[in-house]
């Protein structure tokens, strides 16, 4: 049996570091062979890792060593918040590239949860630093973010058919594709706006009673939220939207993926705090610009952004570990492990 109690990143797949720690108890007369030589990292990196893992209450007694030399010291940078952290990373990357000391592809930025990539991506875009995301989607390409942005666009542009067709069944309302097409055909044939058609959908005989009722409820939600656009703050509007459609509960499927989607939506809520003065129209315009810049393909010479899980087994000349704070890294769940 081969295992390492110092690594346990796949607990959601059933992995548990205690399986290795308890192996001698479960199987008597076991011979333990410690593999302590590290062939990849320098001594400074191993020392930093060892100083952290030594704080584990439950762990095996082993000391990693290497013949790779001392290496450059691990640098610890303390900043005010995640925005300052992202800008510090971008500046270091750009300075090294400008000095022709490194290429963009030499750098990797690691984070614990996918939601953390948003502020890093925006910093990269602001400063014109090429980047790519490995093992995941760019923040504004994630389904849950696209869903909420579609709702916001529909509040601002009541006749945005593309956004309407995206959100009409999100969360699930039991309105099928055929019903949506019948509704749109009826709306266009009668020369109505989408909101007027939703308000008068009871007159659409082509639809079932259930579909008419569900579309009418959606119309009520959109109308009431649209009335808030000029009366509340952008974060307040988004909060009202999430509560009216019960979106967070819709995402809560009791899986790590569901939790990640919820974290992404919470991150979007935090984004709106930075655009309160712009209003909904200004916010949507800014997000469109970011999304356009976000879609550029930079090829291989780009900074790599990825989660710690996705980075397993990979090597980079320069690595930034972000979000080293309680409840993020270590994650809030780690306190119960």
Regions from the language model: what does each represent?
Residues 1-22, 35-41, 241:
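Conserved helicase NTPase motor core
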Residues 2, 45, 89, 109, ...:
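A residue-level signal for conserved active-site and pocket-lining positions in enzyme catalytic cores
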Residues 3-4, 111, 322:
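Active-site flanking residues adjacent to catalytic metal/cofactor-binding acidic residues
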Residues 6-13, 40-41, 133-156, 168:
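Short alpha-helix plus adjacent loop in nuclease-associated cores
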Residues 8-11, 41-47, 54-55, 61-62, ...:
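Switch/connector loops and helix/strand junctions flanking conserved nucleotide-binding motifs
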Residues 9-13, 33, 77, 334-337:
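Flexible beta-alpha connector loops of hexameric P-loop NTPases
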Residues 28-31, 36-130, 153-157, 212, ...:
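Helicase P-loop NTPase motor core
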Residues 117-129, 142, 149-337:
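Conserved helicase C-terminal RecA-like lobe
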């Amino acid at each position: 049996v081969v295992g390492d109690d110092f690594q346990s990143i796949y607990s959601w797949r059933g992995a548990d570091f205690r399986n290795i720690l308890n192996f001698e108890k479960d199987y008597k007369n076991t011979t333990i062979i410690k593999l302590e030589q590290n062939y990849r990292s320098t001594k400074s990196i191993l020392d930093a890792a060892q100083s952290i893992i030594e704080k584990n209450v439950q762990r095996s007694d082993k000391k990693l060593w290497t013949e790779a030399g001392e290496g450059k010291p691990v640098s610890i940078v303390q900043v005010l918040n995640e925005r300052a952290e992202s800008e510090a990373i971008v500046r270091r990357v750009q300075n090294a590239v400008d000095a022709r000391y490194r290429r963009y592809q030499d750098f990797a930025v690691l984070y614990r949860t996918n939601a953390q990539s948003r502020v890093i991506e925006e910093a990269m875009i602001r400063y014109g630093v090429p980047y790519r995301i490995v093992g995941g989607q760019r923040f504004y390409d994630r389904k849950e973010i696209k869903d909420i942005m579609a709702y916001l666009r529909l509040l601002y542009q009541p006749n945005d058919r593309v956004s309407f067709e995206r959100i009409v069944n999100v969360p699930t309302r039991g309105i099928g594709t055929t019903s949506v097409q019948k509704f749109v055909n009826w709306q266009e044939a009668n020369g109505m706006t989408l909101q007027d058609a939703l308000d008068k959908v009871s007159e659409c005989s082509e639809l079932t009673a259930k579909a008419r009722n569900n579309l009418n409820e959606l119309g009520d939600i959109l109308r009431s939220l649209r009335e808030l656009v000029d009366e509340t703050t952008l974060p307040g509007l988004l909060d009202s939207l999430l509560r009216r459609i019960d979106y967070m509960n819709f995402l809560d499927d009791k899986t790590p993926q569901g939790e990640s989607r919820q974290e992404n939506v919470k991150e979007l809520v935090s984004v709106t705090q930075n655009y309160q003065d712009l209003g909904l129209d200004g916010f949507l315009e800014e997000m469109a610009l970011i999304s356009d810049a976000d879609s550029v393909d930079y090829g291989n010479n780009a900074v790599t952004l990825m989660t710690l899980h996705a980075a397993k087994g990979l090597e980079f000349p320069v690595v930034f570990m972000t979000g080293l704070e309680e409840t993020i890294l270590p994650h809030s769940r780690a306190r119960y492990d």
